[in-house]
A protein has these predicted regions:
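Short amphipathic alpha-helices and their capping/turn segments at secondary-structure boundaries
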Residues: 47-66, 122-140, 168-172
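Amphipathic, non-transmembrane alpha-helical secondary structure
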Residues: 119-130, 161-168, 172, 246, ...
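Catalytic His-Asp segment of secreted/periplasmic serine-dependent ester chemistry enzymes
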Residues: 188-287
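N-terminal secretory targeting modules
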Residues: 1-71, 259-287
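Helix C-cap/helix->beta junction micro-motif
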Residues: 102, 174, 208-209
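Conserved SGNH/GDSL esterase-like catalytic core that processes O-acyl groups on lipids
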Residues: 69-71, 79-162
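Conserved beta-strand segments of alpha/beta enzyme cores
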Residues: 107-109, 177, 210-212
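Active-site segments of SGNH/GDSL-like serine hydrolases
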Residues: 147-151, 170-199, 217-221
Length: 287
């Protein structure tokens, strides 16, 4: 999945408005940001393989308290697209915060996919969890996070009712206590009403399940339009930047702590996540 039509439109406008973006510099930054897609995917794949190897080793040779195991599902925002470094993605920052709070080893499997829709989660990511023994299998799963819907909002053939039906089936497959987020604001884009409708459906589905809601939509609606457009987003004007992902991670950490009836960890105070990957990608984009 390449650069979105929306991103090209915004970057093109930026190139014509040098006073805002330095002309063609905006398009150059956009292209560099898009290179994250492959880099981050490969880094997460490498990390996941190393994590699975660690789980197998522990299964064969248990050593003390088992690690706290997190699985993250969803789309490119879960991959960390837009963050300057993959370790600044919200799953990595959340995992680091939980590890610091619990003083315990935390293992993170990120099964998300850039461009994913709710159909992708139901038909690809959930079966992948089953195949890896994470659902009704040998591994004890402690937490699942799910962020999905942004691509569904943009897909004209995805009816909101169909989105909700698939989401409810996904939630029924997940262990209790999953953290599920609403869809961030689409600002002045014409799809904003669909984003609101689908977010409302996410909230309703979560309320009928054993999951917990993480309200990213309310967070993003608090920003003024200029701040949301230029300070919150990365160069593609679609994905959050590193600072915004820190706020996402804090909301997830807050929901996690509330579900456990304990004080929430401070995400900004947690150390950088130590990924089990020799391919920890760092984009050239400097936000």
């Amino acid at each position: 999945m390449g650069i979105s039509k929306r991103a090209w439109q915004v970057a093109g406008a930026a190139a014509g408005g040098a006073s805002l973006f330095g002309g063609g510099l905006a398009i150059g930054r956009l292209l560099r940001l898009d290179s994250q897609r492959g880099d981050y995917r490969k880094a997460w794949e490498d990390h996941n393989l190393a994590t699975l190897d660690r789980l197998r080793q522990l299964d064969e040779h248990p050593e003390g308290e088992r690690p706290y195991l997190i699985v993250s599902l969803g789309d490119s925002s879960v991959q960390g697209m837009g963050a300057s470094r993959i370790t600044e993605s919200y799953p990595a920052r959340l995992a680091s915060s939980i590890a610091a709070q619990m003083d315990r080893e935390v293992l993170l499997l990120n099964l998300s996919l850039s461009g994913a829709t709710i159909e992708s989660v139901e038909l690809t990511q959930i079966p992948q969890m089953r195949g890896l023994g994470l659902l009704d299998g040998p591994y004890s799963l402690d937490l699942v996070t799910l962020t999905i819907g942004g691509n569904d909002v943009m897909a004209e053939d995805m009816a909101p009712g169909q989105f909700e039906e698939r989401l409810r089936r996904v939630l029924a497959s997940l262990p209790a206590g999953a953290l599920v987020s609403t869809i961030p604001s689409f600002g002045i884009m014409p799809q904003e009403s669909r984003a609101q409708d689908m977010s409302d459906r996410i909230a309703a589905a979560v309320a009928d399940s054993d999951a917990h809601l993480v309200d990213l939509r309310s967070l993003t609606q608090e920003y003024s339009l200029p701040t949301y457009t230029f300070a919150y987003h990365a160069a593609d004007f679609f994905h959050p930047n590193s600072a915004a992902y820190t706020k996402w991670a804090q909301l997830f950490a807050d929901a996690w702590a509330t579900s456990r009836r304990e004080a929430a960890p401070v995400v900004e105070d947690a150390p950088q996540w130590d990924m089990l990957s020799a391919r920890v990608a760092q984009s050239e984009y400097d936000d």
